[in-house]
A protein has these predicted regions:
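Structural signature of Gram-negative outer-membrane beta-barrels, strongest in the C-terminal barrel
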Residues: 417-423, 427, 447-572, 615-619, ...
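Outer membrane beta-barrel strand-and-loop segments of large Gram-negative receptors
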Residues: 405-409, 448-460, 540-544, 550, ...
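Short, acidic, small-residue-rich periplasmic hinge/interaction motif at the N-terminus
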Residues: 36, 40-43, 79, 86-136, ...
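C-terminal beta-signal and adjacent terminal beta-strands/loops
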Residues: 271-277, 666-678, 704-766
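Gram-negative outer-membrane beta-barrel transporters
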Residues: 570-572, 591-675
């Protein structure tokens, strides 16, 4: 809190601003959204609007010295858009008259270009990311859905994967990933290095790390709610592209003008045909400390693919429907032949996630709207380790993990007044989760085969009050009944966003959440040492329902392209579980129940000037865990703890060129210190008492967008990026594992981050 007070005192002298001041300003065939961003910077205002109201408006205004009201009047003359200025600070834009403005439906943005163009922070604390509008980010040639999130304060991926990131000290399985209402369980392509979702078909991402709306349940740390394209175009459009890992295609075809269209996309790796430097670098990291890396004469066949198909139907102005399908698949087939001993070994691993979603939105009147969705998600992990001698199979270790997740949700939204609305709804989900380890009778450690079902009934409601001149408040409540567990959980939610003085806002949230599905480690069971986490359901006893309580508070300062965002938080988790072998307790392989406490501060500073955007973020995190019968019942540092993390970047845009340079630095992850004696490794200093060396890397990206000619609509984009420019050798993991038997010694496994990794991208649109 001292840090917050310090920033407030430093900023108070900067708060004076004359709204009547005039500036020279001009626009030449500029997108209206870009024009609004420039006006925000110059006149220290914030625009609120619905994207559909802006359509494809472009604007040209000659250079003149104008006040804010004069600029808005000129825009109205050119576009016909109406405006209303509130409190000399907020500008409401819409197509209708002022009397018809739906304030509840407007975009309540507090920082419009958070890291870069296309990332917005809203008054409820959530972030909106629109990949099609996303500016360049360091190290990325394309707007990867999940890697973009990792640049936000408080989000860290110490293992450098796209999917296994920590949000405010929470484990990666505490993040809920949703695609068109479908819960996704797949961990990503190339064992998490690449997002499972195609960014080129993604329309919008809503990321929530605190104070989630009452409609969101199931996970403790965050929600990543991803929507594919919802607009219905009257023209056929297509895209083709490739990068150093995969190629993809996208097609959007109108079927009935303004009413019905179909969108389809397909992405596939091409490593089975041609291996690039990019793939080899990623593969070196992924397969490090595995048989694939250790044995040189093995045959490794790996590929991934995903596709999406979506129908959008708008029969009239009041109704909108969609049907969406997504499929994600990874395959690995690795074999080794020992001709001298006439033996062979084969590892086969396949992970798939197929989902189906339906949605219907209807406006019953100007004040009442309803949204109903249904989904089914099918996740499968199949692993086989087959040994043959003299061409006859001698052993087959088999691992299975399946999830059948289905549900339906309906919510009603009522605009009570110009400034307030209420939402209430019902959700039903059925989760059927199973895991099995077959033909493993010779192993000392075997997890029991299990198949559990949990049905959940949830009622939720919220009251939202929004007055841009005074305060934004959201009070919500969620009540869930877990049928098979015969348990009820209550989850209050609160969000507050309040103006203190001009340009300075106070933000606060509080929430309680519960989680019934989580991942468990079984590293000792898989010779391949990949995908060593399996999903399982709570059973109310050995695996209780996990509970989280979080509060946060901070402030936001925003003036003329200069933004500061500081947020402090405290989070408490109960009933988390851990396999004691993971903490090096060979006498018992029981699951232990524990608790975790997290305190942290996230800070962000950004400045835009003359085509440049620069930002700096800092995160402090202190996370402690305590488990019964572990570490002598004493607290120890959580494995997700990264005490200090700093990210900084500068980007520049000029016409079609974009450049970005970014640097990351963070303290190392904790690890358990070991010593060598005559019997192997021993552990006498407690759990996670050591800390890995500091991590840092420098990334670069550049893109160029162009037209092939002025006579046709064919456009192109080319990009180049380099991760870890100075090829820093970062140690990111120091762990220990057995080898399928306690009679074998415990082994030390060290893993390193990516070395210097270039990537290329080329894309065409028409």
């Amino acid at each position: 809190m001292r840090l917050i007070y310090f920033f407030v005192l430093m900023l108070l002298p900067l708060l004076a601003f004359s709204q009547e001041e005039a500036f020279y300003i001009q626009f030449t065939d500029e997108d209206i959204r870009d024009a609004f961003t420039k006006i925000e910077d110059k006149y220290n205002v914030l625009f609120s609007y619905k994207d559909e109201d802006l359509s494809k408006n472009r604007i040209t205004i000659k250079r003149e010295k104008r006040t804010l009201l004069e600029v808005l009047a000129a825009i109205k003359d050119v576009t016909g858009l109406n405006y209303k200025v509130l409190n000399n600070r907020y500008v409401i834009i819409n197509q209708n008259s002022e009397k018809d403005v739906d304030f509840n439906a407007l975009d309540k943005v507090v920082i419009r270009s958070y890291l870069t163009k296309g990332i917005k922070k809203n008054s409820d604390g959530s972030y909106n990311i629109q990949p099609v509008k996303l500016g360049i980010l360091p190290g990325l040639t394309e707007p990867d859905v999940l890697e973009s999130i990792q640049l936000l304060p408080g989000v860290l991926s110490p293992n450098e994967t796209a999917t296994s990131f920590f949000v405010r000290g929470g484990a990666s399985d505490q993040n809920r990933l949703i695609w068109d209402g479908i819960t996704i369980y797949h961990k990503g392509h190339l064992f998490g290095m690449i997002s499972p979702l195609n960014p080129n078909v993604t329309s919008e991402i809503k990321f929530i790390n605190k104070g989630a709306h009452a409609r969101y349940g199931e996970r403790l740390s965050s929600v990543i709610d991803v929507s594919s394209r919802t607009d219905i175009s009257n023209e056929t459009t297509a895209e083709l592209g490739f990068n150093g890992i995969s190629a993809d295609a996208l097609l959007d075809i109108p079927i009935i003008k303004d009413k019905l269209n179909i969108q389809a996309s397909y992405r596939r790796s091409y490593m089975d045909v041609f291996e690039t430097v990019t793939f080899n670098q990623l593969a070196d990291k992924v397969f490090e400390s595995t048989k694939i890396k250790d044995i040189e004469n093995g045959n490794n066949d790996f590929l991934f693919s995903d596709y999406n198909v979506k129908l959008n139907y708008k029969p009239n102005k009041k109704n909108r429907l969609y049907a969406s399908v997504i499929s994600i698949e990874n395959q690995l087939d690795y074999s080794v032949n020992d001709s001298e001993n006439n033996t062979s070994y084969t590892d086969r691993l396949m992970t798939t996630n197929t989902g189906y979603g339906l949605g219907w939105s209807i406006d019953w009147s100007k004040k009442i709207a309803q949204t109903t969705t249904a989904f089914f998600s099918d996740y499968k992990l199949n692993y086989n380790f087959i040994t043959k001698e003299n061409n006859e199979q001698t052993s087959d270790f088999e691992k299975r993990n399946t999830i059948y997740d289905s549900g339906i949700s309906s919510e009603l939204r009522i605009n009570v007044s110009e400034n307030s609305n209420v939402t209430f709804g019902y959700q039903y989900t059925l989760k059927d989760v199973a895991y099995a380890f077959l033909n493993t009778t010779n192993l000392v450690f075997v997890l029991d085969t299990e198949d559990n079902i949990v049905q959940t009934h949830s009622l939720f409601g919220s009251y939202d009050y929004s007055n841009l001149e005074l305060i934004d408040v959201s009070v919500g409540f969620r009540a869930s009944y877990f049928e098979e567990l015969d348990a009820v959980r209550l989850e209050p939610r609160l969000q507050v966003f309040k103006s203190i003085v001009k340009n300075l806002k106070f933000q606060a949230t509080a929430e309680i959440k519960n989680q019934i599905i989580s991942e468990i480690d079984e590293t000792i069971l898989s010779d391949l040492s990949l995908e060593n986490r399996v999903w399982r359901l709570a059973d109310g006893s050995a695996f209780p329902i996990i509970n989280s309580q979080q509060v946060s508070s901070g402030f936001i300062y925003n003036k003329q392209g200069f933004s500061i965002d500081v947020d402090a938080y405290f989070k408490k988790l109960k009933n988390i579980t851990a396999l004691s072998l993971g903490f090096l307790n060979p006498e018992s392989n029981n699951f232990n129940i524990g608790k975790q406490r997290v305190f942290g501060v996230d800070a962000f500073v950004k400045k835009r000037f003359n085509g440049f955007t620069s930002w700096l973020s800092y995160s402090f995190n202190r996370s402690k865990s305590n488990f019964d019968n572990l570490n002598d019942d004493r607290d120890f540092t959580s494995k997700s703890n990264v005490t200090h993390a700093v990210s900084s970047a500068v980007s520049y845009k000029l016409n079609g060129f974009q450049l970005a340079l970014g640097w990351k630095w963070q303290t190392g992850k904790p690890y358990t210190i070991s010593q060598q004696d005559g019997d192997g490794l021993v552990f006498n200093e407690g759990i996670n008492t050591g800390e890995l060396p500091n991590y840092h890397r420098l990334d670069f990206s550049s893109t160029y967008s162009f037209k092939f000619s002025e006579q046709n609509k064919l456009k192109g984009k080319v990009g180049f990026s380099v991760r870890n420019i100075y090829n820093r050798k970062n140690l990111i993991s120091r762990e220990y594992t057995g080898n399928n038997s306690l009679n074998d010694p415990i082994k030390l496994i060290e893993k390193y981050a990516l070395g210097i990794t270039p990537n290329l991208m080329f894309r065409v649109y028409w």
